[in-house]
């Protein structure tokens, strides 16, 4: 599987987890989605570029949620 396909799969896994559990802190999402760190962040980037997630920062905390 090439890197673009792996990134798409990672993005799908992240989207599904957010759809089921709702918005959450980045650290918790990372713990729930058990994939390689670089693929996780590539998946986050993919979803952000497509406008499917919202990323908000509060101090050191980063919250990720789906855009409805």
Where is each model-derived feature located?
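Short amphipathic alpha-helical interface segments
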Residues: 6-32
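Short loop/turn and capping residues at structural boundaries
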Residues: 29, 41, 58-59
């Amino acid at each position: 599987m090439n890197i673009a396909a792996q990134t798409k799969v990672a993005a799908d896994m992240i989207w599904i987890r957010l759809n089921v559990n709702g918005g959450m802190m980045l650290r918790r999402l990372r713990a729930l989605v058990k994939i390689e760190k670089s693929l996780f962040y590539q998946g986050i980037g993919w979803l952000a570029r497509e406008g499917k997630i919202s990323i908000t920062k509060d101090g050191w905390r980063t919250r990720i949620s789906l855009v409805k």
